[in-house]
A protein has these predicted regions:
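Phosphate-backbone binding interfaces of nucleic-acid-interacting proteins
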Residues: 1-210, 345, 364, 368, ...
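Extended, well-folded interaction surfaces typified by the phenylalanyl-tRNA synthetase beta subunit core
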Residues: 418-580, 715, 768-772, 776, ...
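Glycine/proline-enriched, intrinsically flexible loops and inter-domain linkers
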Residues: 7, 20, 60, 198-298
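Mobile "lid/hinge" segments at catalytic clefts and subdomain interfaces of large enzymes
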Residues: 116-131, 140-144, 159, 167, ...
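Beta-rich nucleic-acid/ligand-interaction surfaces
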Residues: 36-40, 205-208, 493-494, 498, ...
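A carboxyl-terminal module marker
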Residues: 444-446, 594-598, 603-609, 615-801
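Conserved mixed alpha/beta core segments that line enzyme active sites in large multi-domain catalysts
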Residues: 44-74, 154, 248, 259, ...
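Terminal amphipathic helices with adjacent charged low-complexity linkers/tails
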Residues: 194-220, 397-425, 432
């Protein structure tokens, strides 16, 4: 909280009060931690005298002045000497944990005692025992007691001197509030919440009589991806530690202090929410910065020592000859700052958020900077941040700031304007506020009224203000959500329902599960090797795939164009686990590119896939499909056309599924070689239906008919049929010639054997007739059967005797 109080000096609330109020006003606090929660009675003491312990070679006896008295403390620390100022926990006080850095809940209470016969009235502390780490306090020894600087005041609180009397607060900042990604934004919200004055840092003009433009030239080749780029130069740089107050601020935000130069860039990033970068200007070839897109396949070594390959969508920061950084993500190893740096080039820029997000994913590198840039920063913030960094360099004596700033501004962001409608705001909130009251609340967060246009003007850092509802939210936040009166809605409720496509998918699930299939879910990304495994030809459209730019691995590097691999892999897993009979289904998407390389979004198709082994055959699969079609409202006949073109299916046991002349899927037995590739030793059957292809035929306008009053009459047809005649052709004859009295038919037998002449097969149908208005007469049935038999005879079919 101390960092917040630097900009809201009158803020005087407890951590709990702060947390509750900030959350209620819209800046949600996840939690807070008091750094001194487990510390008590710890003061700065000065060692006046050290003596050897009479009975222990590794212990010493120290006389320590704690301001009010001198106490005797026995310690084994090897790093203390007479005159050192150290943290001392007194009798009855508490430390956070042991020297191993492990905190103890509630702390460890220190009592006076004897060490090898010598009384000790307290304990000198390491930084770990105070609940912190050497990373946060670089000056602390690797092992031993923490030593204060010479100007530390004996007797004062060691907790306060170390900055451990602070509270670390964790916020949950939504992505639309980019202004709150910096401490200044949070402080502005705190000032508004507690009605205190917000005092931002005053940035003074810095720099000598020289011009930065004489030191470096900047060219932005892609203004769309880099709306603003600012650069300033600092020469005669002196690398050293940053001041303690800056180190404490960074440590509270989880950033390890390094040196004054690095700490200043990190400090400004945390303060303004504006990422910065520093280059050693002497490593910049030609003293020139060029912001350009990477070349496809260009390789670059980042600060973390990793070589990364770019594509032509990644924005690079380059000098006259080479790349020196990935824009908005990370700098390069070839321009990193060392302790020997003489002249520094500061960069503060605004990059296209969408491009940074996609680039970060492509190269597999996400940083604090990219996380901020991808939200979309205010271009107007870059200049303020770089000037602040130069001001700190000058104030801390870290270098000589060169005058002027190279500022390439390709986008001037104007304040957003929203019509001010008090009546609508009151109606939306259910309040009765006056115009003046609303304006007072809005003024807290720098939203002002333009009286000439009657518009609310939002500063450029508030890019979340777009419409009247956004303005109403700001009024509600500071009026108080808890003060808004409770009212009941008076509108009419409407019944919601699932989209039509999802209803069809649910029918598919219901039918599949009713028929004994279990649902499976497989990855949408696969290995390019699956096409060979499935025996898919090299020229097949299924091999035209979308390659993932940042895959989990080679086995997940493409978007699938068929669901068969996932289904067969799942069946294989069950087969290997010795499950003897398995039925699975999946409803999942395939991704079919319209053109490669991608210029538009792919065609995403939803496939209903069935797979089984040891639990049925080709005809069982047909039955499931027909049941699904019927329950989806597809009442017309389904046609199965033999096919032999799908190389992953058995050439003599596969068929395309058609409805009203449109191919909507296929089914068949998996080719034995493909089944073997997956390690399945059983006959395996699959079916695939394209959900999008059947939607135009589906419907849920069910018609109900009463129970039939009149009896049905059944006739069996046993026929000798040429082998090339399909069951569908016979059924077409039945439907066309059966008339209105034909109720249903069912194929119940197919036979080929010695008793049937060569080139023929035996087929038998059960045909049901019924008239819903009267009892059928034998003459009607005979006449209808004659029509049917004539139609069958025309196909070369003979009736068996």
């Amino acid at each position: 909280m101390s960092w917040i109080k630097m900009y809201v000096p009158d803020l005087d609330v407890t951590a709990q009060e702060y947390t509750d109020a900030m959350t209620l006003s819209g800046t949600k606090v996840e939690g807070f931690e008091k750094l001194d929660a487990d510390l008590d009675k710890i003061v700065i003491g000065q060692i006046e005298k050290i003596e050897k312990h009479p009975d222990a070679d590794k212990l010493i006896i120290c006389q320590v002045n704690i301001g009010t008295e001198t106490v005797q403390i026995v310690t084994g620390a090897p790093n203390v000497k007479e005159g050192d100022k150290v943290p001392v926990v007194l009798d009855g006080g508490r430390v956070a944990g042991g020297h191993d850095g492990q905190k103890t809940p509630g702390g460890i209470k220190i009592k006076k005692g004897k060490l090898r016969g010598v009384e000790s009235f307290g304990m000198m502390c390491s930084i770990e025992e105070l609940g912190s780490t050497k990373e946060m306090y670089p000056e602390a020894p690797e092992y031993g007691i923490y030593i204060f600087p010479e100007d530390a005041v004996v007797g004062e609180s060691a907790i306060k001197a170390l900055g451990l009397d602070d509270v670390v607060i964790e916020y949950e900042i939504t992505s639309n509030r980019v202004d709150c990604y910096g401490v200044l934004g949070i402080a502005r919200e705190a000032a508004a919440t507690f009605d205190k004055k917000f005092v931002p840092p005053v940035i003074k003009e810095t720099g000598n009589d020289e011009k930065a433009s004489d030191y470096v030239k900047v060219t932005v080749e892609d203004p769309e991806l880099c709306p603003r780029y600012t650069a300033r130069v600092v020469k005669n740089v002196k690398i050293g530690p940053s001041p303690k107050w800056m180190q404490r601020c960074l440590a509270s935000n989880g950033i390890r202090p390094i040196n004054n130069l690095v700490d200043i860039t990190n400090y400004v990033m945390e303060e303004y929410g504006q990422p910065m970068h520093a280059y050693d200007l002497d490593t910049i070839e030609g003293r020139e910065i060029v912001v350009r897109r990477a070349k496809a396949g260009e390789k670059f070594v980042t600060l973390d020592g990793q070589e990364r390959e770019m594509d032509d969508q990644v924005l690079m920061i380059c000098d006259g000859k080479k790349a020196v950084g990935i824009a908005g993500i990370m700098g390069g190893e070839n321009s990193m700052i060392t302790d020997n740096v003489h002249t520094v080039l500061f960069e503060a820029a605004c990059f296209n958020g969408t491009n940074i997000r996609l680039s970060s994913k492509r190269i597999g590198l996400r940083t604090d900077a990219s996380g901020k840039f991808e939200k979309g920063l205010d271009p107007n913030n870059a200049k303020a941040a770089i000037d602040r960094a130069c001001q700190l360099m000058e104030e801390l004596g870290a270098g000589e700031v060169v005058g002027g700033c190279v500022d390439i501004c390709n986008e001037v962001r104007e304040p957003s304007r929203v019509p001010f409608e008090p009546e609508r705001i009151n109606a939306l909130l259910g309040t009765d506020l006056t115009k003046e009251e609303m304006l007072a609340y809005l003024a807290k967060v720098e939203l002002t009224l333009d009286p000439e246009t009657n518009e609310i003007v939002a500063p450029t850092f508030r890019q979340d203000i777009h419409c009247m509802a956004d303005v109403a939210e700001e009024v509600a936040r500071f009026f108080g959500y808890d003060k808004i009166p409770t009212t009941l809605p008076n509108g009419e409720a409407t019944t919601g329902k699932l989209p039509f496509k999802l209803r069809i998918e649910n029918v598919a699930r219901d039918i599949a599960e009713y028929c004994g299939f279990s649902e499976g879910m497989t990855y949408s990304f696969e290995s390019p090797k699956v096409f060979d495994k499935l025996r898919i030809p090299e020229n097949s459209d299924l091999r035209k795939v979308i390659t993932i730019s940042n895959p989990l691995g080679e086995d997940y590097s493409i978007m699938r164009t068929t669901t068969l691999n996932g289904m067969l892999s799942s069946l294989a897993t069950n087969y290997n686990r010795r499950n003897k009979a398995v039925r699975l289904y999946e409803i999942g998407k395939v991704y079919l590119p319209k053109a490669l390389p991608l210029t538009e979004l792919p065609d995403e198709r939803t496939h209903f896939t069935l797979g089984m082994y040891g639990a049925g055959d080709f005809f069982d699969m047909k039955g499931v499909i027909e049941e699904f079609f019927e329950k989806s409202g597809m009442k017309k006949k389904v046609h199965y056309t033999p096919d032999s073109n799908k190389t992953y299916l058995h050439p003599g046991r596969q068929a395309n599924i058609s409805y009203e002349g449109k191919v909507v899927g296929y089914l068949g037995e998996v080719h034995p070689l493909v089944a073997g590739n997956y390690g399945i030793g059983e006959r395996t059957y699959v079916a695939v239906i394209d959900i999008q292809d059947i939607l135009e035929f589906c419907g849920f306008n069910h018609k109900f008919t009463g129970i039939a009053k009149y009896p049905a009459v059944t006739r069996d047809l046993s026929m000798v049929v040429p082998k090339h005649i399909l069951a569908g052709q016979i059924e077409d004859v039945l439907e066309q010639r059966g008339g209105k009295i034909l109720e249903s038919y069912q194929l119940f037998d197919i036979y080929e054997g010695a008793q049937i002449k060569p080139g023929y097969k035996s087929m038998a149908y059960s045909v049901v007739f019924r008239d819903h208005e009267k009892t059928l007469e034998e003459a009607e049935i005979t006449a209808t059967m004659k029509k049917i038999l004539n139609g069958l005879t025309a196909l070369g079919i003979e009736l068996r005797s």
